[in-house]
Amino acid sequence: MYTHGHVDHVFGTPVFDAENAELGRPRAKVLAHEEVDPRFDRYIATAGYNGVVNQRQFQLPAFQWPTDYRRPDVTYRDHLDVTVGDTRFELHHARGETDDATWVWVPDRKVLCPGDVIIWCAPNAGNPQKVQRFAKDWAVALRAMADLGAE
């Protein structure tokens, strides 16, 4: 499951795909918010620009923006319940750092997986070289997660 479409959250998938192929197992299904796929399209269209911006921001002069993405197999708009074994996962959409963020609640275990809806600084409203963030919606999502009583 992708918590959002930033490259640091989606580029580990090929390792799992390769292992499954090597072991003769089917490829795992990737779940994500419906805006992840359009994000990948934007990333491909702006790869040169994103490469330059990220080289400067992260001081990585050799960094090349990727153009090959493992697309989601299952997408959702507002909310999706998924059961794996006997565990139910509630996927919730939030706009915060990105417009395609997902946070996950595991109600039977009172476990919260916030993805990057919780990061080292909030709200991170963005910077002039990147897409603006969604500070008000982000605050609403943080309150919704806080109200769950995660343990």
Q: Can you annotate each of these PLM segments?
A:
Residues 27, 31, 35-151, ...:
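Metallo-beta-lactamase
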Residues 5-11, 37-39, 98-99, 119-122:
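Active-site environment of divalent metal-dependent phosphoester hydrolases
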Residues 1-6, 31-33, 113-115, 150-151:
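Active-site neighborhood of phospho(di)ester-bond hydrolases with catalytic His/Asp-centered motifs
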Residues 11-15, 41-46, 123-126:
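Short acidic, glycine/serine/threonine-rich loops at helix termini
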Residues 1-29, 75:
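Active-site metal-binding motif and surrounding structural segment of the metallo-beta-lactamase
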